[in-house]
């Protein structure tokens, strides 16, 4: 007898909004040589095929740093670097071109698989490579001749777009051609960044050895603004990790974000399904560098009523919150502040002012179950207190039956019912017998 798979059903339902949002979007994938030689690369290829099936336009930029170093070492050539850039002489470049060419064919072969009973069955991905990147030499710096090391001069946006319009997957190597007929060794991070910015891509996705950028506790930081990411980059450089994959990809992500790419992501190439979880779940798995946060606290509007009801209904049924009808919410929606994350309301609170006494009640405080162990409650209290202060309120109070200690930990002190505004005293429910706590905010 076949068994139901509720986890599969749940995953499909949760990912549906993101499938709709991402369809037709352009993603640039940046994959270093470390990712390509990792055992999980076959799974990443399957995930790339899935993205293509879902109608996402893909450009894959690959690097070859470890493969280059290994091939040069076998040839007895010591790798030379200056200011984090490889110095590519004639002998080195001949080997690097062979390595990159081999990798390009290997990646194309992997993306072309169509074996039965595999995720690639019937994938039929059309992989397109070409002279999409025009390069120029780096020249001489500090007396060091970079020889065949170059930088990106121009991206053929029209050519790449034409291939994407025809549902091709564009594969770009770190070797670029110049207008003089020469070729140059490029930084794959620079290539990916320029492609993402010039294409006006929706996302740049970087595959790192770690699950994004880690904090001091070894946990992945879910979201960073460019300024915050820059501070972490300085810390990495001071720790001597300026050449690490995380540092290189972080530089590219920051520059892409500042160049107009809305979101750049750092995910692990070692963890199976990391990219899919990052793209198709609300909280992701890695780190995203964003121009604007996916989460915001704001005043509620009439369109938010359905989401607020979904959030507070379970708490009303448990007796934690007083029941509110849709009609009541519609009339009082201007009193609500919400926290929204990717279209989902994960927190709400209402502010009822009693101007004569310069007091206000914070009511209907609710946080989504998946976010109760975070600081969303503190954010909500701070936002409501800030709003009350702007209105001239000096004292904020709450009525609660279950969350007394939570509010006490945040500076709220016990208050007698008799100390409430007269109008609020008349509405006090003596059967419910809620505890009253207050906090000075002036």
From Swiss-Prot:
Chief place where the protein resides: cytoplasm
- Write out the catalysed reaction: L-glutamate + acetyl-CoA = N-acetyl-L-glutamate + CoA + H(+)
Q: Does the keyword Acyltransferase apply?
A: yes
What Pfam families does the annotation carry?
AA_kinase, Acetyltransf_1
**UniProt GO MF annotations:** L-glutamate N-acetyltransferase activity
Q: Which residues form the N-acetyltransferase domain?
A: 295-442
What does the record give as EC number?
2.3.1.1
Write down the CDD domains for this protein, in alphabetical order. AAK_NAGS-ABP (cd04237), NAT_SF (cd04301)
Where in or outside the cell? Cytoplasm
User: Could you confirm whether the keyword Acyltransferase appears in this record?
Assistant: yes
Keywords from the UniProt entry: Acyltransferase, Amino-acid biosynthesis, Arginine biosynthesis, Cytoplasm, Transferase
Which residue ranges run through the membrane?
none
One GO BP on record is: L-arginine biosynthetic process
Q: What class of enzyme is it?
A: transferase
What pathway does the annotation place this protein in? Amino-acid biosynthesis; L-arginine biosynthesis; N(2)-acetyl-L-ornithine from L-glutamate: step 1/4
Instruction: List, alphabetically, the NCBIfam families matched.
Output: N-Ac-Glu-synth, PRK05279.1
HAMAP family, from UniProt? N_acetyl_glu_synth
Other remarks?
In bacteria which possess the bifunctional enzyme ornithine acetyltransferase/N-acetylglutamate synthase (ArgJ), ArgA fulfills an anaplerotic role.
Q: Which family does it belong to?
A: Belongs to the acetyltransferase family. ArgA subfamily.
| Name under which the protein is recorded | Amino-acid acetyltransferase
